[in-house]
Amino acid sequence: MNITVQQLDDIRKSGETHTLLDIREAEELAAASISGALHIPMNTIPENLDKLPTDQPIVVMCHVGGRSAQVQMWLHGNGFENAVNLEGGIHAWSLSIDSSVPQY
């Protein structure tokens, strides 16, 4: 399941409880980030499942949405039915929601 950056912006503005999971690598995080995101690189997700909430939506984010779609499907298959993919990733967020987030 996917959500748009507009939907995520609405969730954040409403104060609805959620976790924004940034699965990008550290170098990408240094280039651009969204405040409040939980950073767990994609290749370390399996060993960090205990850091993920089971009682709220998890919005999985990467650069443009490809890796996060894979992680969302994997999480869903491993019991995190509340995981959704952020379409377009941080790139779409920068273009449509917050131009202060650098593009790379």
What residues fall within each predicted segment?
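Rhodanese-like catalytic fold shared by cysteine-dependent sulfurtransferases
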Residues: 1-19, 26-57, 66-104
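Short, surface-exposed ligand- or partner-binding patches at beta-edge/loop junctions that are enriched
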Residues: 61-62
